[in-house]
C-alpha cells in the first residue's frame, strides 16, 4: 500500500562552482563516497569527538564535511522542534554556507547526539495514535527530513519511504488515500483493544473501497475470526490470498485465526501461500537529489520525495558500547569494505511473534541470496549456534546471549533483531539492546526507539542482506529494506560495503606533491571495471565538488581560482551499474601562482596528551594573521605574519587529527594562502593510579552525602531522577557527595553531568570539571584498573535542586548502589 501527500518540507540546496566547462548539474548523480557524507559531532562530548575523529581518519572524510553542535539540551532525547531547529537545520545551514549541501547524501551522527525524538508535539493535543507512538529515531527522522519539515505527520506513514524496494507481489497493490490510511490505523487500534465489532465495520468499508488490497482483507479476516464469524473470516482470508497475500507464517501464528486452523479451507489457503516464493525489487542507487515516485521508481522529472541517508556511528552512553569498542567496530568495518568476505547469512526462526511476523519471507530471502552465489541458511531457534561464519543475521526474540551461541560475527556483517525495545538505549532499558551486536563484531545493527506494535514495516525486511550483498553500502541497504523507518535507530558505519566491486583509479599527468600553475589536466586510468563502464567523473578540490565530466572527456581545472598553497585533488569515477559504484583517487598538490607560502616549524607531531597545549609556530610574509583550524573550526590565531599560538587539544578530541594553517592576507579574509597541515595524534594523559585495594564485599553499596556541620550524613542509593538532593534535605545547603568505584581495566572512562547549578567534580582528589548550569557536560578520566574515589562539592539551590551524574566505560549509568560504594554504612 502507498500513502502519499504533497511534500512541503526542507529541501537541500547548493551550487557547484564550475572552474571549467563541463557537464551541467541539472541532474544529480548517484553513489556514496566520503565526500558525500556529513559528520555531525557533539562538540561538548569527548566520546563524540573521539569516535568522529576515527571515522574521519578511516574514510578520509573532508574537514569541511564535519559539523559541530554544542549546548544540546539532551544527548538521549530531543523534542521535534529541537531536532528540526537545533540539530538538522543548523547542520544543513552550515553545509550550505560552505557550498557543500548539493553533494551531501548522508548525515551520520557521532555518539552523544539525541537517539530519540519526541514527536508528540506534532499531533493535535500532543496525542499521536497508538499505532504511531510518541517517539521517532534521529536516524529515521533525518532520512525523512523533507516530510519531517513539512508541518504534517506523514513521516509516520507505513509507506513513507518511496526508496523502499517493495517485494514484487504477484498482484500490484493499490494506493490508499490519506483518509483510508487513517481509517486503517484506527481499525488496528481497535483490534489492539479487542473492539472487534467496530474494527470489523471499519475494515469491511475499506475492503469495499479498496478490493485489491491484500493486507486489508487479511486484517479483516483476523477481525472476523476474533469476533466468532468463522465463515466470513475464511472468505476474507481467501480474498487476501487471491490478491497476493503470501505470509503463511503470519497466518499460522495469528492468535486471531486460531478458530480457523482445523478448517479444510484454511489448510488449503496455507498450502497455497507456502508455495509462493517472492522476489525483492532490484536494488537502486541513492542520491539525495534523486526524487522517488509512489511506485518506488526514480522520477525522471525530479518531482517526488527526497531523502538523506542517516546512521549513528555508535552509542556510548546508557546501554551502549565503550569508545574503544566503537573504534574497534569502525576499524573492522573499514577493513571489510570491498573485501567480498565469505561466510553465511543466517535467519533464525522460532515460535515467538517477533519471528513469525517476518519469517514467512525467510525462504524467499535465502533463495535470493543463493541466486547471487551467497551462502544463506534458515536455523531453528533464537540464534545461529556454533557458526563461525556469520556474515549477517536476522532474528526475532526479546533477549539473546550472543557469547552463549558460540557463533562468530564476521567483519562487515549486519545483524537485525525484531523486538520492541532494541533501540531504547537509555539505562534501565528492557530487552537486549542493538549495541550487543556491535560489541561482538557487527558493522551495523538497528532497533526501534519506542513500542513498534509488531508492525513489520517498521523493521528491515529479510531482503536487507540481499541488497547489502548486491554491492550497496550499509546505509543504502537498510533504507531499501524499511518501508516506515521513522522509529528505527540505525547504528553503524554507513559507508561499509563489503560486496562493492570498486574500480581502481589513478591519474596520469598529476603526481602526488606536484606543483601546479594555471590550467591543469588529469587523465584517469581505471581498472577493475569488468563489463561495466565509467558513466562520469566528479572532480573534488579540498572536499568540495567543483565539476562533473562525462566519460571520455579529459578532466581539467584552473588553479588560478585557488589560493596558493596545499590542496587535495580528488577524482571520483561513477560506474554505470545498478548501485552506481564509485572508485576514487586523491592527490595532494601545491598551487603556486603567486609565489606565496606559509612556513610551519613542525608539521608532524608525535602523540600529544589532550591536557597539554599544542604550541604552533608559523610565518607567512605580509600576512595579517595565520588561522589554525581543525575541521573548519578556528582553534587559534597567530597575529601578524609570524609568531606562535597555543591550542587546547580538548577541543580537538582524542585520535588522529590535522590542524590546518591558513594565512590571511587582507582584512576581509578573501585573500589567503593555504599552509601545510600539522598531523598529530591526541592521546589520553597518564592514568590516574588506583587507590589502595579494598574488598568490595566489605563495603556498603551506597554513596555518602554530608551537609552542613552538625547534620548527620545521609546514604544515597540512587541519583537517576535528579531530585535526590532535595529529597535528602540538601536544598539550599553546601554539600559533599562521596563514593568509591572500581574499574575493570586500564582505560578512559567518562562522567556525564547536568544540573541547575555548578558543582565541582573530582576524581582521586583531582578536579575534573565544574559544569555550568543547564547543559550536559562530558568529562573523560584516564584511570588505572582498580578502585577510585569520586567527590562532588557544591551548594544546592534552595528551590528544586536538580543534579544528574552518570559514569561508565561500556555505556554510562547514574551514580548509585549498583556501581558505587562507601567504607562506612550510615543509616538513611
Where are these regions (language model features)?
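Short, compositionally biased P/S/T/A/G/V-rich stretches that sit at domain boundaries
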Residues: 491-525, 529, 588-611, 681-684
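Short beta-strand segments within Ig-like beta-sandwich modules, predominantly Fibronectin type-III
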Residues: 545-552, 636-642, 769-773
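Alpha-helical protein-protein interaction modules
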Residues: 180-263, 276-277
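Cysteine-dependent hydrolase recognition
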Residues: 31-204, 208, 253, 271-523
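Extracellular/secretory pathway-exposed regions associated with glycan biology
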Residues: 681-750, 754-828
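Surface-exposed, short loops/turns at beta-strand junctions within beta-sandwich domains
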Residues: 559-566, 649-656, 784
Amino acid at each position: 500500500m502507498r500513502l502519499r501527500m504533497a511534500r512541503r518540507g526542507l529541501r537541500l540546496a547548493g551550487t557547484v562552482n564550475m572552474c571549467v566547462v563541463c557537464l551541467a548539474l541539472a541532474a544529480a548523480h548517484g553513489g556514496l563516497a566520503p565526500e558525500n557524507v556529513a559528520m555531525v559531532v557533539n562538540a561538548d562530548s569527548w566520546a563524540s569527538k573521539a569516535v568522529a575523529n576515527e571515522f574521519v581518519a578511516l574514510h578520509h572524510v573532508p574537514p569541511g564535511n564535519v559539523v559541530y553542535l554544542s549546548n544540546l539540551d539532551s544527548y538521549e532525547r530531543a523534542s521535534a522542534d529541537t531536532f528540526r531547529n537545533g540539530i538538522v537545520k543548523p547542520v544543513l545551514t552550515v553545509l550550505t554556507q560552505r557550498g557543500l549541501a548539493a553533494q551531501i547524501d548522508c548525515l551520520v551522527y557521532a555518539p552523544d547526539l539525541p537517539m530519540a525524538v519526541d514527536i508528540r508535539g506534532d499531533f493535535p493535543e500532543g496525542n499521536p495514535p497508538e499505532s504511531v507512538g510518541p517517539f521517532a529515531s534521529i536516524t529515521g527522522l533525518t532520512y525523512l527530513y523533507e516530510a519531517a519539515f513539512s508541518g504534517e505527520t506523514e513521516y509516520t506513514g507505513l509507506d513513507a519511504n518511496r526508496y523502499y524496494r517493495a517485494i514484487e507481489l504477484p498482484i500490484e497493490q493499490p494506493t490508499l488515500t490519506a483518509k483510508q490510511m487513517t481509517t486503517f490505523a484506527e481499525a488496528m487500534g481497535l483490534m489492539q483493544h479487542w473492539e472487534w465489532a467496530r474494527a470489523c465495520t471499519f475494515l469491511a468499508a475499506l475492503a469495499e473501497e479498496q478490493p485489491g488490497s491484500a493486507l486489508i482483507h487479511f486484517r479483516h479476516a483476523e477481525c472476523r475470526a476474533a469476533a466468532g464469524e468463522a465463515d466470513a473470516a475464511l472468505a476474507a482470508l481467501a480474498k487476501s490470498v487471491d490478491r497476493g497475500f503470501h505470509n503463511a507464517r503470519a497466518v499460522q501464528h495469528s492468535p486471531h485465526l486460531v478458530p480457523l486452523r482445523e478448517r479444510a479451507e484454511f489448510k488449503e489457503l496455507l498450502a497455497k501461500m507456502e508455495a509462493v516464493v517472492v522476489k525483492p525489487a532490484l536494488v537502486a542507487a541513492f542520491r539525495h537529489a534523486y526524487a522517488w515516485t509512489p511506485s518506488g521508481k526514480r522520477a525522471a522529472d525530479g518531482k517526488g520525495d527526497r531523502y538523506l541517508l542517516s546512521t549513528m556511528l555508535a552509542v556510548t552512553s546508557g546501554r551502549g558500547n565503550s569508545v574503544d569498542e566503537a573504534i574497534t567496530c569502525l576499524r573492522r568495518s573499514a577493513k571489510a569494505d570491498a573485501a567480498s568476505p565469505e561466510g553465511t547469512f543466517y535467519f533464525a526462526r522460532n515460535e515467538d511473534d517477533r519471528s513469525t511476523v517476518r519469517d514467512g519471507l525467510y525462504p524467499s530471502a535465502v533463495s535470493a541470496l543463493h541466486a547471487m552465489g551467497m551462502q544463506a541458511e534458515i536455523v531453528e531457534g533464537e540464534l545461529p549456534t556454533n557458526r563461525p561464519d556469520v556474515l549477517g543475521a536476522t532474528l526475532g526474540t526479546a533477549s539473546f546471549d550472543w557469547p552463549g551461541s558460540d557463533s562468530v560475527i564476521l567483519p562487515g556483517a549486519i545483524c537485525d533483531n525484531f523486538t520492541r525495545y532494541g533501540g531504547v538505549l537509555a539505562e534501565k532499558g528492557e530487552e537486549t539492546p542493538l549495541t550487543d551486536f556491535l560489541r561482538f563484531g557487527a558493522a551495523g545493527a538497528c532497533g526501534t526507539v519506542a513500542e513498534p506494535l509488531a508492525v513489520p514495516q517498521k523493521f528491515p525486511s529479510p531482503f536487507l542482506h540481499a541488497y547489502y550483498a548486491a554491492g550497496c553500502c550499509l546505509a543504502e541497504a537498510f533504507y531499501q529494506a524499511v518501508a516506515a523507518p521513522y522509529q528505527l535507530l540505525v547504528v553503524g558505519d554507513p559507508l561499509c560495503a563489503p560486496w562493492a566491486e570498486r574500480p581502481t583509479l589513478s591519474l596520469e599527468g598529476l603526481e602526488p606533491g606536484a606543483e601546479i600553475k594555471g590550467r591543469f589536466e588529469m587523465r584517469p586510468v581505471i581498472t577493475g571495471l569488468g563489463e561495466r563502464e565509467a558513466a562520469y567523473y566528479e572532480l573534488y578540490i579540498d572536499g568540495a565538488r567543483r565539476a562533473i565530466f562525462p566519460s571520455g572527456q579529459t578532466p581539467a581545472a584552473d588553479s588560478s581560482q585557488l589560493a596558493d598553497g596545499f590542496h587535495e585533488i580528488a577524482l571520483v569515477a561513477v560506474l554505470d551499474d545498478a548501485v552506481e559504484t564509485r572508485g576514487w583517487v586523491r592527490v595532494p598538490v601545491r598551487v603556486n601562482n603567486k609565489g606565496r607560502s606559509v612556513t610551519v616549524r613542525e608539521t608532524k607531531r608525535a602523540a600529544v596528551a589532550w591536557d597539554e597545549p599544542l604550541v604552533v609556530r608559523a610565518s607567512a610574509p605580509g600576512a595579517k594573521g595565520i588561522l589554525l583550524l581543525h575541521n573548519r573550526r578556528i582553534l587559534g590565531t597567530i597575529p601578524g605574519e609570524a609568531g606562535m599560538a597555543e591550542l587546547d587539544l580538548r577541543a580537538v578530541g582524542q585520535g588522529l587529527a590535522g590542524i590546518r594553517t591558513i594565512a590571511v592576507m587582507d582584512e576581509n579574509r578573501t585573500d589567503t594562502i593555504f599552509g601545510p597541515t600539522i598531523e598529530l595524534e591526541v592521546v589520553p594523559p597518564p592514568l590516574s593510579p588506583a587507590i589502595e585495594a579494598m574488598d568490595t564485599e566489605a563495603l556498603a553499596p551506597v554513596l555518602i552525602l554530608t551537609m552542613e556541620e552538625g547534620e548527620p550524613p545521609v546514604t544515597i542509593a540512587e541519583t537517576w531522577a535528579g531530585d535526590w538532593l532535595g529529597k535528602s534535605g540538601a536544598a539550599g545547603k553546601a554539600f559533599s557527595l562521596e563514593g568509591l568505584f572500581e574499574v575493570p581495566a586500564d582505560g578512559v572512562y567518562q562522567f556525564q553531568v547536568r544540573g541547575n547549578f555548578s558543582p565541582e567534580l573530582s576524581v582521586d582528589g583531582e578536579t575534573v570539571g565544574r559544569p555550568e548550569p543547564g547543559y550536559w557536560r562530558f568529562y573523560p578520566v584516564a584511570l588505572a584498573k582498580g578502585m577510585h574515589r569520586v567527590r562532588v562539592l557544591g551548594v544546592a539551590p534552595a528551590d528544586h535542586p536538580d543534579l544528574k551524574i552518570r559514569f561508565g566505560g561500556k555505556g554510562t549509568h547514574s551514580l548509585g548502589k549498583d556501581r558505587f560504594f562507601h567504607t562506612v554504612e550510615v543509616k538513611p
